[in-house]
Amino acid sequence: MTPRTVCSVEKPILIIGAGISGLLLAQRLRQEAIPFRVFERDADLSTRGAGWGLTLHWSLPALRSLLPDHLAERLPEAYVDRAAVARGASSCFPFFDLSTGELKAKTPKASESQRIRVTREGLRNLLATDINIEWEKALAGISFSPDSATAEFDDGSSVIGSLIVACDGGQSAVRRSLFPDQWETHKLPVRMLGVKLQLSPDQMKSIHDLDTFFLQGTASSNDSFVYISVLDAPENHALSTEKYICQMCVSWPYRDGFFNNALPTEIPNSNEERRRFIHALAQTWAEPFRTLALNIPIDEDIKHLTPQDFVPDLNFRTSDRAVLMGDAFHAMAMYRGEGANHAIVDVLDFVDRAVPVLRDNQGITTLRVALDEYEDAVIKRARPGTLASRRACLDAHEWHRINGDSPLLTKREMMSQYAEDD
């Protein structure tokens, strides 16, 4: 018979990564009085800047149920435009033909209780409340004994715990340690540039005339794609900056013939070359997309990205005292905006299945059964979601595929109806 092991104060749960799933899990474990430690490779919460704007919708009930009441009440602190929400504004997420400016699709409006727009940075700041994050702790490896899990860091230190929970993102070091031959993400045939825009209220009017929070579209003439997302608004601050902060992302298909180039168009090397490339694409777009792109400041840093995903196999299974969560389990392309929603519900699925075992100090055999059930639940939900997001990414750069049946435009829901052979 397997010896009974216990989760004691000396052996906390080791959360690797202080992203949304890691911090939300920490908040819940704190409420359950289950010991934990959080390790993050970055230097602090501001290392990565504001990050993406996130739409939280079908995960909102889970988020609110996992947080203590006093933090759930503070969610508006993470809103991209608190004053707009207070006025009752809601996004329709309009989708345009960039070549003509014609509206192709939009979603029904939703109340604040059903859908919110937040920044990743703002949500992380909120979730980090009262959580002791151990910074600059990059994972180097993991190991197991019958009654413990050990996390080893690149500074030479190591920590022993009862369970390792990988919340360390799409390039998860934990996943790499567990699956050295199958940890890599799948690179999609798309390339992306992203830039921050600081806009006056007058400059924002062309965006606000179309939507309060978010614009997106594909050019029917060349399959380039753009989205513009509000990240911050003047009234969010006691001392108004009088500037809106928006994120503009421009992406294109990585294939022969795009934009009359014989070979696939690579990401330009220098910042100036990237700006000129965006300008060239913008000449083919309608307003307001054209002017917004042409007015990118010369000195504004333009970042680059290759969309990637990680689709867990149907029979995917971790082992020993380790489990994956969020992007570490199912990294998604951002074209359906569901990655954060899945990460939040991952935490709920873990709490429902594994926390009772941990709280009652049950042994590894019972814990492993609970973790297997958690993984089954996540794969059933997130595998179709990841594949739908992949298809949405590809469709966003093939105008002829964009219709009401494309995952790019279909309803966002927890259990995606996307079939694997689509």
Show which residues each predicted segment covers.
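Conserved FAD/dinucleotide-binding core of flavoprotein oxidoreductases
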Residues: 94, 102-119, 194-298
